[in-house]
């Protein structure tokens, strides 16, 4: 398989690649509208507008302890940017997520029922290793094995990217003087654009001495890797547009759903019933949702492989020669066949489950347009170390706490988040009319070695100039004089 430059770029975009989906500033906000449906489908009932349209929104987040970028920040995009692999004896990870929302529309049918629909492009990926030692002075595999005596090597990586179209329905289940319960359901039809996985299990080497030299020989382990077959359709000599048509044409359908509910504890203060917005007032709002219950299916590409039972005479120097510059995946596979006793292709299909998770959100309004929101996200996905043909992508976010000041037109937000890998970030966001701009980690702005951990989001949301105009039966209204 040889993709060429455009194919490589496409592969990086789709394969190394995200509640609202990481738009942390507006989680729980009554003004989130169509952008909030991804965090809880019931939330679309708690927006004081008859409609709103997210023309587009874009979110990117990365997190790693394996790589550091140097001389780079949002304030200083230097010309001498470099990167290095982080040293130390530790587990390593790199995770990435991305989403693009296009024309997401929310329509209030009444104050007690609403719908939303739109299209999204989403991409998730993560690579994780077992404990291994590394430093940037290593020159070859012999030196690497030397500082990793008695290490058992394990690693796995999964990526999935897809296009989805969704429709959401939400309605009020009960509404009394003290509380209200809203529930919502989102149905999604998906098209898997790109899928890939890789595994290394129980790899080990055996130390041997030959004269004054220490040699390491392969001892045990098994590996497998696969990718979606549409990459095989990318051909050199064809135009990029023709390749894209062929690439996207060889994809499969999938389906997913979201479930959510929001429970409101109403304010018991005296309210002005002539003010429409008092309908949306609450003391507490508690949301619970199950998100991304579904999967994408991919056919195996021609160069997908499984390998086991290493040959006993393969030395560290042989690995340097055979894999120093593999060039293409086909050449890599040819080299792999010379160092193991069992190697074969992989046929049929594999599944990658979406980042299924339980989300609990609590929102507490304060005085003078201030509020605070807490959001807990718990991944419900399985392990990527198994022997089956089902794999999982996962959400990076674990816990967020977001103080905010917000009106219809303006907003300032301070999301504080803890990731599933223990990263602690302080971000911020601002809303100015239809525009929302945010960053996940302030360190991206000021420090020149933190760009690998963080990201940004932006959204353009169109809303009407006035609030909800309730459509009521006017037959019993008093006549106007």
Which residue ranges define each predicted feature?
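Bacterial Sec-dependent N-terminal signal peptides
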Residues: 1-25
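Subset of outer-membrane beta-barrel
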Residues: 21-481
């Amino acid at each position: 398989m040889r993709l060429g430059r455009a194919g490589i770029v496409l592969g990086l975009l789709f394969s190394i690649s995200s509640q609202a989906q990481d738009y942390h500033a507006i989680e729980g906000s009554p003004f989130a509208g169509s952008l909030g449906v991804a965090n809880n489908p019931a939330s679309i009932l708690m927006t004081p507008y008859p409609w709103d349209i997210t023309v587009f929104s874009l979110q990117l987040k990365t997190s790693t302890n394996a790589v550091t970028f140097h001389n780079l920040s949002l304030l200083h995009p230097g010309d001498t940017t470099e990167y290095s692999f982080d040293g130390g004896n530790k587990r390593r990870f790199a995770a990435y997520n991305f989403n693009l929302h296009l024309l997401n529309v929310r329509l209030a049918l009444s104050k007690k029922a609403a719908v939303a629909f739109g299209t999204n492009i989403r991409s998730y990926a993560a690579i994780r290793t077992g404990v291994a030692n590394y430093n940037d002075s290593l020159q070859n595999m012999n030196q690497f094995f030397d500082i990793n005596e008695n290490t058992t090597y394990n690693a796995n990586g999964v990526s999935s990217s897809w296009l989805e179209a969704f429709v959401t329905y939400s309605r009020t289940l009960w509404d009394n003087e003290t509380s209200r319960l809203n529930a919502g359901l989102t149905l999604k039809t998906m098209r898997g654009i790109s899928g890939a996985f890789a595994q290394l299990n129980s790899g080990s080497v055996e130390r041997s001495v030959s004269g004054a030299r220490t040699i390491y020989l392969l001892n045990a382990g098994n590996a497998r890797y696969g990718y979606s077959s549409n990459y095989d359709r990318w051909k050199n000599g064809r135009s990029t547009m023709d390749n894209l048509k062929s690439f996207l044409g060889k994809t499969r359908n999938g389906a997913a759903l979201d479930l959510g509910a929001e429970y409101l504890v109403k304010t018991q203060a005296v309210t002005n019933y002539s003010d429409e917005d008092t309908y949306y007032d609450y003391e507490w709002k508690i949301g619970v949702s199950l998100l991304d219950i579904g999967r994408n299916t991919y056919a195996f590409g021609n160069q997908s492989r499984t390998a086991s039972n290493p040959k006993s005479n393969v030395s560290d120097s042989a690995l340097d020669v055979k894999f120093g510059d593999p060039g293409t995946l086909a050449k890599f596979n040819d080299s792999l066949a010379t160092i193991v006793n069992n190697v074969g292709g992989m046929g049929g299909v594999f599944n990658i489950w979406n980042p299924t998770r339980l989300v609990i959100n609590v929102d507490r309004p304060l005085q003078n347009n201030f509020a605070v929101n807490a959001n807990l996200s718990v991944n419900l996905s399985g392990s990527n170390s198994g022997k089956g043909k089902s794999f999982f992508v996962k959400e990076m976010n674990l816990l967020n706490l977001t103080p905010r000041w917000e009106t219809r037109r303006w907003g300032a937000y301070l999301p504080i988040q803890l990731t599933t890998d223990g990263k602690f970030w302080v971000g911020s966001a601002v809303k100015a009319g239809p525009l929302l701009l945010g960053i996940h980690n302030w360190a991206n702005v000021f420090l020149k070695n933190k760009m690998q951990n963080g990201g940004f989001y932006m959204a353009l949301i169109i809303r009407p100039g006035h609030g909800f105009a309730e459509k009521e039966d006017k037959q019993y209204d008093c006549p106007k004089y």
